[in-house]
């Protein structure tokens, strides 16, 4: 199969003209072992001699879908996909040339994006391991009919490119070991629950900020203040060390696959933006809009992960919980966007927690309930406080929404992570217990006889351990609006 990686001239708009030579070719995101999104109109594109006729014939219906190569040498045709199944073949013809795709499946496609916690493979990072890795790798080959992987590794680009140098892969132990743990476990859960194949496009870059995943235009329309914009522009000075410059990852990894038929996005990012608690929600909202516009779906599902607790070199610091509250705010302002909480899945000594399966399972459960409308019997919406009652006896009573069953601590140990402050605004560790109704928590501290504020899990790391009886963690919260 003839392929080509083609750089686009500056100023070319996404989805518009893309100039290059006349050689007949197909974008790399279409290859043998791929998954087409089921029951939709899926675009297929490539390049060829202007004026030539290109015909795509999928074996699931035998129909011919034809188009003419544009003057700029690009072509695109939409193919109707059927219900889940396979393997199928797809023939792409142009004159006497033919590209044959084999072992093609119809099912669900999700695009997995973010930084290192999304990138972290089943095999782990050095001494940082993934729980369940051995079992996943050993059993990978048995899932060839259920899971397929397209792993993007394109370097950052200063201008948009038209194609990527990657190919779809059928799972083996080696493929599984190199694949995003979050992506793999998500696909495994979703495929088993839906009974259909699942393809994942893994597109993650360790250490990346959110800005490289956006165009400069998307950043401009995020509604940032002058100071916030100045801070973003200042990081370009460090672009040689980290992928931080706006648009670089968009150019090299998102633009080339934009429009590929998929159900939705997974996003696990934030560590590199953790000190932007005042504007990250605006950036994420604008990024989601950019992606949805590029895919032509105004409410394409967007599922993302709240940052887990970690020392960050200052375990008593509060940058992380402030940032998590900003992440939570973005879910409220963005339609068809849902966050999952990882507050009890963190690790004090590593920024890459090992419990990737639990996070992926929560993403899958949220997708099943909110995207596919399937009740799995485990509510995954995280509990949030609905009211605070500061009693005269010094006890603070916190009532929660979205509990669904009972609040409890991990392994029924003493609840940790609460703090109280009095008029001096100095926070002290507090005791807490769940009331008989399972949805109310009483908090007290001998050092704070007259509390005026209560916080939970409001440190970078404090060993907080409260969750529902279904194992859904409670995210950081606070009753005050103080600056720190």
Describe the predicted segments one by one.
Residues 22-484:
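Cell-envelope and extracellular/periplasmic
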Residues 7-17:
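Bacterial N-terminal signal peptides
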């Amino acid at each position: 199969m003839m392929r080509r990686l083609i750089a686009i001239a500056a100023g070319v708009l996404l989805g518009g003209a893309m100039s290059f030579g006349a050689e007949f070719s197909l974008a790399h995101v279409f290859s043998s072992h791929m998954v087409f999104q089921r029951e939709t109109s899926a675009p297929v594109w490539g390049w060829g001699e202007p004026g030539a006729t290109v015909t795509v014939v999928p074996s699931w219906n035998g129909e011919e879908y034809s188009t003419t190569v544009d003057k700029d040498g690009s072509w695109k045709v939409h193919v109707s996909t059927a219900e889940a199944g396979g393997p199928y073949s797809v023939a792409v013809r142009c004159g006497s040339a033919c590209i044959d795709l084999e072992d093609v499946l119809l099912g669900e496609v999700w695009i997995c994006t973010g930084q290192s916690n999304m990138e972290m493979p089943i095999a782990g990072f050095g001494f940082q391991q993934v729980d369940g890795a051995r079992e996943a790798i050993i059993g990978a080959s048995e899932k060839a009919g259920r899971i397929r992987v397209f792993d993007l590794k394109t370097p950052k680009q200063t201008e948009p490119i038209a194609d990527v140098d990657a190919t779809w892969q059928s799972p083996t132990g080696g493929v599984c070991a190199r694949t995003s743990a979050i992506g793999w476990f998500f696909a495994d859960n979703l495929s088993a629950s839906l009974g259909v194949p699942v393809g994942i496009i893994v597109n993650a870059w360790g250490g990346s900020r959110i800005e490289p995943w956006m165009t400069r235009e998307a950043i401009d329309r995020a509604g940032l203040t002058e100071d916030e914009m100045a801070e973003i522009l200042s990081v370009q000075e460090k672009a040689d060390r980290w992928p931080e410059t706006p648009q670089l990852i968009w150019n090299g990894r998102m633009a080339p696959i934009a429009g590929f038929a998929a159900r939705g996005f997974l996003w696990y990012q934030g560590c590199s933006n953790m000190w932007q608690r005042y504007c990250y929600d605006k950036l994420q909202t604008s990024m989601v809009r950019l992606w949805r516009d590029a895919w032509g779906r105004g409410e394409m599902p967007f599922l993302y992960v709240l940052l887990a607790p970690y020392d960050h070199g200052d375990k008593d610091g509060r940058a992380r919980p402030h940032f998590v509250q900003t992440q939570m705010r973005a879910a409220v302002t963005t339609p068809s966007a849902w966050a999952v909480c990882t507050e009890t899945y963190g690790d004090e000594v590593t920024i890459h927690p090992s419990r990737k399966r639990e996070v992926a399972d929560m993403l899958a459960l949220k997708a099943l309930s909110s995207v596919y409308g399937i009740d799995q019997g485990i509510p995954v919406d995280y509990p949030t406080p609905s009211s605070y009652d500061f009693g005269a006896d010094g006890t603070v009573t916190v009532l929660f929404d979205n509990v669904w069953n009972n609040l409890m601590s991990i392994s029924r140990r003493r609840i940790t992570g609460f703090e109280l402050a009095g008029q001096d605004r100095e926070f002290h560790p507090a005791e807490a217990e769940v009331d008989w109704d399972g949805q109310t928590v009483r908090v007290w501290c001998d050092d704070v006889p007259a509390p005026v504020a209560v916080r939970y899990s409001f440190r970078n790391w404090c060993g907080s351990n409260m969750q529902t009886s279904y194992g859904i963690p409670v995210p950081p919260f606070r009753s005050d609006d103080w600056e720190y």
